[in-house]
């Protein structure tokens, strides 16, 4: 067991030496040792910060880090063997952390510290962590009688398993699909680099011709560019019926998972004394009540809908007059929008993409980080889980302050979407030594083909900056308590502030120019082309925003239900939301909710509104840079008041410290082109 690398992870895990067969013994050994150490804490006659809170942090961090690596690998290099052990261990890890959260002896010891003279001697970050811990004990059921604790533990274990199964069904359904073409004739209109990607996908299976899958670069290439309407409809139908009863003979159908997840969430909330799961979700967020969130979303939807109606009318007219599509359907909208954008603003996304090789984009991203915060990134060779992964150290005045893994390209066996997660968090130990934070930054960009460098679309650059914003939030923390350093302890509806804030810089010409180099001439992005892009920034913005309101309202409404008998009515709730906010209705076979992993497998249950909520904060925060002539000084202030403090104080306090006032909706409305909306 001593040679099991998962028991000795260190600063950077030896990913090249991790064996699937080592996972189970490592985790079970770590959990067994942890339980012995927790028993020792409870056997002590004296209780203080060092021998209780600090010691428990040591214990949980070790187990949590092992599971973090396993969970990460399950997301990025899924294999049948890895998935089997992951699913087998999911209940064990859930039970372990549930036991801690429900341990009345530990809870009482934490209360002793809160009520002791020592509490006043703790740092503000330590006090915040202790208060969060006490809250989390209550939300884990520490105050419940034993029989209800057991019921809650069972619900939490089942909930974790349901989320994992939901995500795995989506991945399996995505990877199971493929259509093949012998020649490129049916692919007319699709950009050359995407056609090369289809050819590479076929070659990877030992086939000639072209393979189109449902990974997001494949889907977008067809739905946005393919002149072949039948192909667009075929790919659209396959994409929106993933993980449903309408695809793969129902083998990956998530319908039961959705209904069981909703029932599980409601039972959990009621056991803890809440009327519904939305109330429980908001217990750890900035927003106070579900009604406050619903009012916020309805207000934004009301403001956006007139613009969405105008957007849709413009697309319908253009499709009819210029594309000979009399009645545009869901699979026509992205295609027609791209053609309209080209006609209206005289540029295409394909043209833009030619300017952004990944090497220049990363160099430009790093230059912007240095400009804002004085931080440099330097590549370092470390063990990784896939040949495409790169690792960078963050340096301040030559000193390493953190590190980030970047896994940027789509591939089979990798979960879709983009995300940032932490491997470890900043922490100062009792002896004064400092543990540095490390993050994973994962995207699903169009991969390079052959010896050609990958090139990013402007949307992909926005995604990269977004996830980097999350990463910087985790890595630039200056808090020494692991429970509130970086993104830890930050309210979920504020966690998107740093990520959405970073997106704004991708709309500055100087930023884009320094990361551009045309694939043929090496020329930088022309100002004329940028001006066209900027003019088109809010193109179809109304349609986009009402779609986001549809997602967020659906999420909040289904988790706001108090009657278990009505939980199966979620399709009707979605229809009702669409009737209120949407300007176009999808076909009856659309099963979007069955792949809505954010709210059924990704931690955003009764929390998807966070994107819009945090966009108010991020637009207002960026406005400080628009108002300032000194970007570096404003960047240092944003670092100090928002990024550095992590979860050690409330997000509302951090925002007010940066802006000097409460957040305002004005900047978001202005950036969205809605500032003249009533």
Question: Which residue ranges define each predicted feature?
Answer:
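Active-site-proximal, well-structured secondary-structure segments within enzyme catalytic domains
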Residues: 129, 161, 168, 173-213, ...
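Short, surface-exposed loop/turn segments at secondary-structure junctions
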Residues: 42-53, 76-80, 248-251, 280, ...
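Short His/Asp/Glu-rich catalytic/ion-coordination signatures at enzyme active sites or charged loops
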Residues: 7-22, 70-89, 112-154, 213-256, ...
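Short, hydrophobic/amphipathic alpha-helical patches that form generic packing surfaces
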Residues: 61-72, 135, 237, 333-341, ...
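C-terminal, non-catalytic "cap/extension" segments appended to globular domains
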Residues: 1-22, 29, 188-189, 197, ...
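N-terminal helix-rich structural modules
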Residues: 1-190, 625
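Short pre-active-site segment immediately N-terminal to the catalytic Zn-binding motif
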Residues: 446-465
């Amino acid at each position: 067991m001593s040679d099991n690398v998962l028991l000795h992870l260190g600063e950077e895990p030896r990913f090249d030496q991790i064996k699937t067969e080592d996972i189970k013994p490592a985790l079970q050994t770590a959990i067994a040792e942890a339980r012995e150490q927790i028993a020792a804490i409870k056997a002590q006659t004296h209780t203080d910060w060092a021998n209780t809170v600090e010691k428990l942090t040591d214990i949980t961090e070790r187990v949590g880090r092992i599971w973090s690596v396993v969970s990460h690998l399950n997301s990025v290099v899924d294999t049948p063997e890895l998935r089997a052990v992951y699913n087998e261990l999911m209940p064990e890890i859930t039970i372990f952390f549930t036991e801690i959260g429900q341990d009345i002896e530990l809870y009482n010891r934490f209360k002793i510290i809160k009520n002791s003279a020592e509490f006043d001697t703790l740092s503000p970050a330590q006090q915040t962590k202790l208060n969060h811990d006490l809250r989390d004990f209550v939300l884990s059921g520490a105050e419940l009688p034993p029989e209800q604790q057991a019921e809650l533990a069972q619900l939490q274990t089942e909930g974790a398993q349901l989320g994992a199964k939901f995500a795995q069904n989506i991945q399996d359904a995505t990877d199971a699909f493929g259509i093949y073409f012998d020649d490129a004739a049916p692919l007319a209109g699709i950009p050359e680099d995407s056609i090369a990607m289809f050819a590479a996908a076929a070659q990877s299976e030992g086939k000639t011709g072209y393979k189109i899958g449902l990974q997001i670069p494949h889907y977008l290439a067809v739905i946005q560019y393919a002149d072949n309407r039948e192909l667009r409809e075929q790919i659209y139908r396959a994409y929106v019926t993933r993980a449903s009863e309408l695809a793969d003979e129902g083998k990956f159908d998530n319908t039961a998972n959705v209904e069981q997840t909703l029932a599980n969430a409601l039972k959990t909330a009621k056991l803890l004394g809440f009327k519904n799961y939305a109330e429980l979700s908001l217990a750890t967020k900035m927003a106070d009540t579900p009604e406050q969130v619903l009012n916020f979303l309805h207000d934004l939807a009301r403001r956006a809908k007139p613009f969405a109606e105008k957007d849709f009318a413009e697309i319908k007219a253009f499709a009819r007059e210029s594309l000979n599509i009399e009645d545009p359907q869901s699979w026509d909208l992205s295609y027609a929008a791209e053609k309209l954008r080209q006609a209206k603003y005289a540029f295409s996304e394909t043209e833009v993409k030619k300017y952004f090789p990944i090497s220049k984009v990363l160099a430009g991203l790093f230059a912007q980080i240095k400009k804002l915060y004085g931080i440099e990134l330097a590549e370092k060779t470390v063990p990784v889980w896939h040949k495409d992964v790169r690792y960078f150290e963050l340096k301040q005045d030559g000193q390493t302050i953190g590190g980030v893994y970047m896994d940027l390209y789509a591939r089979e066996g990798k979960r879709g979407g983009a995300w940032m997660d932490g491997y470890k968090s900043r922490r100062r130990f009792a002896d004064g030594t400092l543990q540095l934070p490390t993050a994973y930054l994962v995207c699903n960009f169009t991969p390079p083909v052959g010896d050609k460098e990958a090139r990013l679309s402007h949307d992909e650059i926005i995604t990269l900056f977004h996830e980097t914003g999350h990463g910087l939030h985790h890595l630039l923390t200056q808090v020494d308590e692991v429970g509130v350093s970086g993104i830890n302890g930050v309210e979920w509806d504020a966690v998107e502030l740093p990520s959405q804030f970073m997106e704004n810089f991708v709309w500055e010409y100087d930023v884009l120019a320094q990361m551009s180099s045309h694939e043929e001439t090496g020329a930088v992005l022309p100002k004329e082309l940028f001006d066209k892009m900027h003019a088109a920034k809010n193109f179809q913005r109304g349609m986009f925003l009402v779609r986001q309101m549809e997602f967020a309202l659906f999420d909040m409404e289904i988790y706001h239900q108090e009657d278990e008998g009505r939980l199966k009515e979620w399709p009707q709730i979605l229809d009702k939301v669409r009737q209120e906010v949407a300007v176009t209705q999808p076909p009856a076979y659309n099963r979007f909710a069955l792949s809505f992993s954010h709210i059924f497998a990704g931690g955003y249950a009764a929390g998807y509104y966070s994107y819009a909520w945090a966009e108010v904060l991020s637009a207002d925060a960026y406005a400080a840079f628009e108002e300032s002539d000194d970007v570096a000084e404003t960047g240092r202030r944003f670092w100090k008041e928002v990024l550095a403090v992590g979860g050690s104080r409330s997000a509302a306090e951090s925002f007010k410290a940066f802006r000097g006032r409460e957040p305002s909706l004005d900047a978001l409305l202005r950036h969205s082109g809605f500032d003249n909306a009533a």
